[in-house]
Amino acid sequence: VSGVNRMDAMFKDASEFEGIGLQNWDVSNVTRMSTMFANATNFNGDISNWDVSSVTTMYSMFKEADAFNQDLSSWDVSNVTNIQWIFCNADSFNGDISTWDVSNVTSMYRVFSSASSFNQDISSWDVSNVTDMSVMFPQAVSFNQDISSWDVSNVTNMGYMFYGASSFNQDISSWDVSNVI
């Protein structure tokens, strides 16, 4: 697959697909992975070694991939600009993505919405370019990490950001929310 540059919706709705044999795919030229595994409810393939450094959009990539919980810690996502919905309803995902460079992302809309198992340290994420954090953690019932150091000064929308995030109990009083409408 080394010549492929778009993998949008490749396994979308493939509910029985488990992802066996994907670990050695050369995806280094792929720029789009939107909805790639969306609704692939049994997908839990090892894609930890994928070179995703050319990818610019991961919109809804693992949305409702209920079984997915693989190591993505080594992924270089520095060119990604769109991660909206990426882990929405990914019920099992609780991977370490603390080192992800999300500095080019401007919207965190529904990134962890209903990601019921996710509770990882993302305090070092550079979110200074983000303007939309609406519906980012709703129903993320396990999430309770200290994100007080985030620079949210450019965010204009935080609607429903922690709606139903029943475990979240962190002090975010230092956030500059002066631009939130």
Listing of model-derived features with the role each one plays in the protein:
Residues 1-181:
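Negatively charged
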